[in-house]
Amino acid sequence: MEVQIGIDLMGGDHSPLVVWQVLVDVLKSQSSTIPFAFTLFASEEIRKQIQEEFISDLPQEKFPKIISAENFVAMEDSPLAAIRKKSSSMALGLDYLQEDKLDAFISTGNTGALVTLARAKIPLFPAVSRPALLVCVPTMRGHAVILDVGANISVKPEEMVGFARMGLAYRQCLGDSKIPTIGLLNIGSEERKGTEAHRQTFRMLRETFGEAFLGNIESGAVFDGAADIVVTDGFTGNIFLKTAEGVFEFLQRILGDKLEADIQRRLDYTFYPGSVVCGLSKLVIKCHGKACGSSLFHGILGSINLAQARLCKRILSNLI
């Protein structure tokens, strides 16, 4: 049975035609062993342009269905403005997902708008009060799962415990056989470090996960592979993620070709799928607004794998 993937062509930092070309590359690459099909959401102008000028890019049987939208959510739109655009490409894609016409929905658009619209249209799991954005980052021991990286500015300690459970389910989808370890991102490793909310979260994580909870970890220890799952609030997590991306881009510019290909691959966040909006009953994935080329290519392939692995059902079973 084909995995149905919906993709919002609009609203990212690049032209919709750049996203289209990546989709063509995915369809031609045969990189996935999982049968899949795309449904695209775009303005009428872009739909016509693709069907008139790029019809020869793919065989007719592989050509994706394109759904016309009246408008799209821009990067500068507030979440409230996004909600008012009821027929935007993002809103239509989430409607299709909610109606079970899709197994996953991907957007490179406005993060705040995507999370807000997804919460409005897609039910949360009963045990979840807030969703979290989850990403994988490379480490010396493989990779770590980090959440939240931007969905919530501040969270309650009990919500952080829920984030850890969702991270465990995600690692299981990646085929981890061992029991993953959990760390709390903080300004120091000692138990007393951080705010009162951090200290309360520390105690709750220790009570819930026992020896699997390693305690507080600092930002640098994340890349050492100190923990398999790193829990944080969205404000701190977003700063951490964007700093990591900036450091890698800095190294690329400074070292250029001196970085060997295998090292570049290990460091490059573009080889990891986009952020998963965890806690929703259906799979929503946010790829970076600047994503193009290998970044979006691997984000889409990763999304296909997560949809096939029934990530949302696994998360639910981990929460109840």
From Swiss-Prot:
Entry keywords, A to Z: Cytoplasm, Lipid biosynthesis, Lipid metabolism, Phospholipid biosynthesis, Phospholipid metabolism, Transferase
Pathway connected to this protein: Lipid metabolism; phospholipid metabolism
Gene3D superfamilies listed in its UniProt record: Isopropylmalate Dehydrogenase
Molecular function in Gene Ontology: phosphate:acyl-[acyl carrier protein] acyltransferase activity
Cellular compartment(s): Cytoplasm
GO cellular component terms, A-Z: cytoplasm
GO biological-process terms attached to the record: fatty acid biosynthetic process; phospholipid biosynthetic process
Keyword Cytoplasm: yes
Domain of life: Bacteria
InterPro entries in the record: FA_synthesis (IPR003664), Phospholipid_synth_PlsX-like (IPR012281)
Catalytic activity: a fatty acyl-[ACP] + phosphate = an acyl phosphate + holo-[ACP]
EC number(s) on file: 2.3.1.274
Biological role stated in the UniProt entry: Catalyzes the reversible formation of acyl-phosphate (acyl-PO(4)) from acyl-[acyl-carrier-protein] (acyl-ACP). This enzyme utilizes acyl-ACP as fatty acyl donor, but not acyl-CoA.
Family to which this protein belongs: Belongs to the PlsX family.
PANTHER family given in the database record: FATTY ACID/PHOSPHOLIPID SYNTHESIS PROTEIN PLSX, PHOSPHATE ACYLTRANSFERASE
NCBIfam families: PRK13846.1 (NF010420)
Assembly with partners or alone: Homodimer. Probably interacts with PlsY.
Name used for this protein in its record: Phosphate acyltransferase
Lineage: Bacteria, Pseudomonadati, Chlamydiota, Chlamydiia, Chlamydiales
